[in-house]
Structure formats: structure tokens, C-alpha cells
Design a protein with these regions (language model features):
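Nucleotidyltransferase catalytic core that binds NTPs
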Residues: 1-139
Length: 139
């Protein structure tokens, strides 16, 4: 039985930091499932994305390490954990564990019940969408 990995993110202005993160996330299992935060959701909590949710999904779907891409406008990942029988959720270590669980609407107890573990990868702030946007504004 294959091990399924879930990552969640906006993935706007796709860059090398995203590539490195997804390559690392893929090493935690056999199938990589990506939930893209939809346009509506992203605009409410962050900013309006530069690329549409469909464009971001197309870019991610083209990567060989990616098995499934879905767009969501909900922070709650429980339906996707159950739909895909997720084994591991991977995120950058720029988030504190409890804050991230709150963001994705999960509890430690729920994850234990579902046999889901959390894994965190190094976050490289030198390569980020925010940094790219800042550079573009300075042109």
C-alpha cells in the first residue's frame, strides 16, 4: 500500500523554493497530494493571487513528483485526509506546530485517530513569493 503525503499552500508565483519544498515533501511517501488554496480563500486571508487557482493547479500538475492537485476554499483539510487516506502532512517549518494545526482545522487527537503524522521541512525565506513581489515592485 502506498504512503500518501499531503501539502497545502497557495503556490502563487511558482519559484525554486516551491520546487525544493515539493521535492522534499515527496520523499515522505509514494504519492504527493497538493491542496491549493483557492482564489477566494487566499484573497481573504493573504492577498489576491497573481496567478489564478486554475493556472496554479496546471503548473503543479505538470510536476513529475505530484500525484493529485485539488483546489480548496476551506482551511479544513479533514475531508481530504479521509478522501485520500493521508499518512503524512508536510509543511515548512516557518509555522509553529500548534498554529499550523489550528490553520488546517485539525487536532492532535484527530491526527492520531487517522494515523496521520506531521513533518516539517526547512523554510528558505530568501526564496519566497513575498520576496519576489517586493523585487517586482522595486523595478
Amino acid at each position: 500500500m502506498s504512503k500518501k503525503v499531503l501539502v497545502v499552500g497557495v503556490f502563487d508565483l511558482f519559484h525554486r523554493g516551491h520546487v525544493e519544498f515539493l521535492k522534499k515533501a515527496a520523499t515522505f511517501g509514494d504519492e504527493l497530494i497538493i491542496l491549493i488554496n483557492g482564489d477566494e480563500m487566499t484573497e481573504k486571508y493573504k492577498r489576491r493571487p497573481i496567478y489564478s487557482e486554475q493556472d496554479r493547479a496546471a503548473i503543479l500538475s505538470a510536476l513529475s513528483c505530484v500525484t493529485v492537485v485539488e483546489i480548496t476554499n476551506s482551511f479544513d483539510v479533514k475531508p481530504y485526509i479521509e478522501k485520500y487516506n493521508i499518512d503524512v502532512i508536510v509543511h515548512g517549518n516557518d509555522w509553529e506546530h500548534d498554529s499550523y494545526l489550528e490553520q488546517i482545522r485539525c487536532t492532535e487527537e484527530y491526527l492520531r485517530q487517522q494515523n496521520v503524522t506531521m513533518a516539517y521541512t526547512d523554510y528558505h525565506s530568501s526564496v519566497s513569493t513575498s520576496a519576489l513581489l517586493k523585487q517586482i515592485k522595486e523595478l
